[in-house]
Amino acid sequence: MTRAKSGKISKKRHKKILKLAKGYRGRANSCFRVAIEKVEKALLYAYRDRRNRKRDFRGLWIQRINAAVREHGLIYSQFMGALKKAGINIDRKVLAELAVNNNDGFTSIVQQSKAYI
């Protein structure tokens, strides 16, 4: 029985990794052994940072809402508590967007929530 060498398969696997390593510095873009380590690490970073991005954006929205609410003499925690009591169900992403781009709409929401403080 002849020996089965996995030439096609390993070449395909190498090409796939080297394609992902395109643009890396030094031997990391041409040497398979180095490239596979760099690609694995890059994919781990990408996975981790997709989760961190959600965390970072939530923090950004809270900062924007807090800054806009302080112009009306409130603080963020009071405002969010008043919104909950008022039954206004708007998420932080939309509130931050209103605070930045539609100041009149945000002001009306703040006025409605002030009654519940």
Curated annotation (Swiss-Prot):
Domain of life: Bacteria
Ranges that cross the membrane: none
GO process terms (BP): ribosomal large subunit assembly; translation
A Pfam family it matches: Ribosomal_L20
Function: Binds directly to 23S ribosomal RNA and is necessary for the in vitro assembly process of the 50S ribosomal subunit. It is not involved in the protein synthesizing functions of that subunit.
Family statement: Belongs to the bacterial ribosomal protein bL20 family.
Protein name (Swiss-Prot/TrEMBL): Large ribosomal subunit protein bL20
Provenance organism: Rickettsia typhi (strain ATCC VR-144 / Wilmington)
Gene: rplT
